[in-house]
């Protein structure tokens, strides 16, 4: 069958993405293959420009948001399929065309959870968060290296960033009895790296805060307890308006903040949290939950105060933090979906 004829009868198209080449498989309404070809990445829009509107599944991954937006502009219904959801539909050995076929099969299933297409603004915001996260990791590595070098020479510093920052200048100035001139120079260089990383992190954090204040969605999210500019902007960058999740519990499950279920028959077995989905956003919600737990005097100011007070009497601190992070994530998703600020409704206590 010719490509032109195939294009006119394709009901569903699966696209396996590569750095330079995309592999296409088209299926008709009976599931038969009517299109099989590979296209250069730069020609995919022109190739599908004259194809009648159809369902297109594209492998979620590198640079797929741009391709998905371009194909959506042509009128196609484009969905990004995670590779893990397409894998069960692949038959035989793995190759690019079989992956494309698996994507075409998976995208037709109502149960397949697809990745929402991000806008340019979301990608920009996500990039800021990823750069900041990398810099924070580098700063932590530098600090740990300074501590380890000092400890090798018998100098132990109390745990905490503040104590190292306060004591390091005096150590370098006064402990030449145990630190050689070479080691002092090495640690001074590392201290300079630390300062430069601090400056870059502060600059990016300030930019994120400005963007968060300029976004209505972020401002509404920041009314949720424990949620500040970093969490709010990271959430908007990750899920947009939150319509990909039917319920708040679905968002919490996507973040991996629910127990892993291993049930059979009449036995319900719950294990540790799944830790699936967006690890960065999950970490931020956990940090927000721990900040709230540090201030028990303020618990009753929140609508979940009575629940939190009761849970604190029966749950381990880490389990309590996870449960609270789950609740905060569900509240945040509701705020995002309903496009309104969080309102704490606390029931008055009766005598």
Q: Model features per residue range: what roles?
A:
Residues 1-10, 153, 341-342, 351:
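Charged, often Cys/His-bearing segments associated with DNA-binding zinc-finger transcription factors
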Residues 1-79, 86-88:
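Glycine/alanine-rich phosphate-binding loops at beta-alpha junctions
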Residues 2-10, 202-227, 235-241:
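Extended, structured, electrostatic nucleic-acid-contact surfaces
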Residues 79-127, 168-170, 267-276, 280, ...:
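Short alpha-helix plus adjacent loop in nuclease-associated cores
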Residues 89, 95, 220-223, 229-317:
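Phosphate-backbone recognition surface of nucleic-acid-processing proteins
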Residues 130-220:
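Glycine-rich, often acidic, oxyanion-interacting loops/wings at catalytic, nucleic-acid
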Residues 266, 306-351:
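Low-complexity, acidic/Ser/Thr- and charged residue-rich accessory regions of DNA metabolism proteins
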């Amino acid at each position: 069958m010719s490509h032109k004829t195939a294009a006119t009868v394709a009901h569903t198209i699966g696209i396996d993405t590569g750095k330079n080449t995309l592999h296409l498989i088209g299926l008709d309404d009976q599931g038969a293959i009517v299109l099989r070809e590979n296209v250069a990445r730069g020609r995919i829009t022109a190739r599908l420009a004259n194809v009648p509107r159809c369902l297109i599944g594209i492998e979620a991954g590198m640079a797929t948001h741009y391709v998905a937006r371009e194909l959506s502009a042509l009128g196609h219904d484009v969905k990004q399929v995670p590779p893990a959801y397409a894998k069960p539909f692949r038959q035989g050995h793995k190759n690019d065309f079989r992956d494309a076929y698996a994507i075409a099969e998976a995208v037709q299933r109502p149960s397949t959870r697809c990745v929402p297409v991000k806008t340019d603004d979301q990608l920009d915001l996500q990039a800021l968060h990823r750069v900041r996260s990398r810099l924070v990791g580098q700063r932590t590595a530098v600090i740990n290296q300074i501590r380890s070098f000092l400890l090798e020479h018998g100098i132990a510093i109390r745990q905490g960033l503040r104590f190292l920052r306060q004591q390091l200048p005096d150590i370098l100035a006064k402990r030449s009895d145990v630190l050689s001139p070479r080691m002092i120079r090495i640690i001074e260089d590392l201290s300079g790296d630390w300062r430069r990383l601090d400056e870059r992190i502060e600059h990016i954090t300030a930019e994120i805060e400005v963007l968060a204040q300029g976004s209505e969605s972020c401002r509404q999210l920041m009314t949720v307890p424990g949620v500040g500019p970093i969490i709010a902007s990271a959430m908007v960058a990750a899920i947009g308006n939150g319509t990909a999740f039917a319920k708040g519990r679905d968002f919490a499950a996507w973040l991996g903040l629910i127990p892993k279920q291993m049930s059979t028959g009449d036995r319900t077995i719950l294990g540790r949290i799944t830790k699936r989905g967006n690890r960065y956003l999950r970490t931020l919600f956990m940090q927000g939950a721990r900040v709230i737990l540090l201030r028990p005097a303020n618990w009753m100011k929140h609508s979940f105060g009575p629940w939190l007070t009761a849970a604190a009497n029966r749950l381990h601190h880490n389990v309590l933090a996870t449960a609270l992070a789950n609740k905060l994530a569900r509240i945040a998703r509701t705020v995002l979906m309903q496009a309104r600020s969080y309102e704490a409704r606390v029931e008055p206590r009766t005598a």
